[in-house]
Amino acid sequence: MAPHTEQLTRPAVRLRGLTRSFEGRTVLDGVDLDLPAGQFTALLGHSGSGKSTLLRAIAGIDHGVAGSGTLTAPGRVSVVFQDSRLLPWRRVLPNVLLGLDGEDAEERGRAALAEVGLGGRERAWPTELSGGEQQRAALARSLVREPELLLADEPFGALDALTRIKMRALLRRLWERHRPSVLLVTHDVDEAIVLADRVLVLEDGRIGLDLTVDRDGPHAHGGYRTRLLKALGVFEDAP
Ligand SMILES: Nc1ncnc2c1ncn2[C@@H]1O[C@H](COP(=O)(O)OP(=O)(O)OP(=O)(O)O)[C@@H](O)[C@H]1O
């Protein structure tokens, strides 16, 4: 069954009893979730727990997948994947502008590229960019659409450790500036804590843990890490 998606004037996600299954195997088993406007949320879970399935459902790109429940999402949604998905036969700026209307589109595209640190690379081909630069271009392509909701499916998963650190900082900076709601799917507990204000753990087809990260509160990074690892069944001090 197709998801019931209606456009809202305010950017927020609301899921009620969302189910999705593949070949009779239930992956999402009645997910209830609200994502308030402007919140940065990370989604953790074991491999195969259904994180991408949930993200694709919210993005409205899971046509043909069996399921039920209600889903409300904002009108302007951008999605970033692990690979940049830039069209190799188009230069960087046209990639960013793809499908964008308006007289000021080019100006906005250039500004977005400058914002992600790719000013001056507008005429480069995607293959001339490093992996990190390609992901920067993908972020520019997302942000130029001024999304109310940014869905990111392991956007830094294929990058080296140093580039990943820089890209995390960039994403947080862009979020602070533009304030879309963000749902970041990641395998990386530390990435989730460093970036997000709320961390969810998907478990047995539902949200098993819903943790608020209070940066100004008394809890240190390590405390959140231990709780999240425990929810994921990882006990670091076990032999
Ligand atoms: N199109 C599909 N057809 C059949 N099964 C699918 C399809 N998409 C996902 N699945 C199955 O649904 C389950 C959840 O997949 P999903 O990709 O959502 O998990 P995930 O938590 O994102 O995993 P990972 O962290 O490894 O990317 C998996 O068992 C997967 O094989």
Locations of the language-model features?
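Catalytic Walker B motif of ABC-type/P-loop ATPase nucleotide-binding domains
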Residues: 150-153
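Conserved structural motif at the start of ABC-family nucleotide-binding domains
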Residues: 13, 28-30
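A short, proline-enriched helix->beta-strand linker immediately N-terminal to the Walker B motif
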Residues: 144-148
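The feature captures the beta-strand-to-loop junction immediately N-terminal to the Walker
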Residues: 44-46
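Conserved ABC ATPase signature
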Residues: 125-129, 133
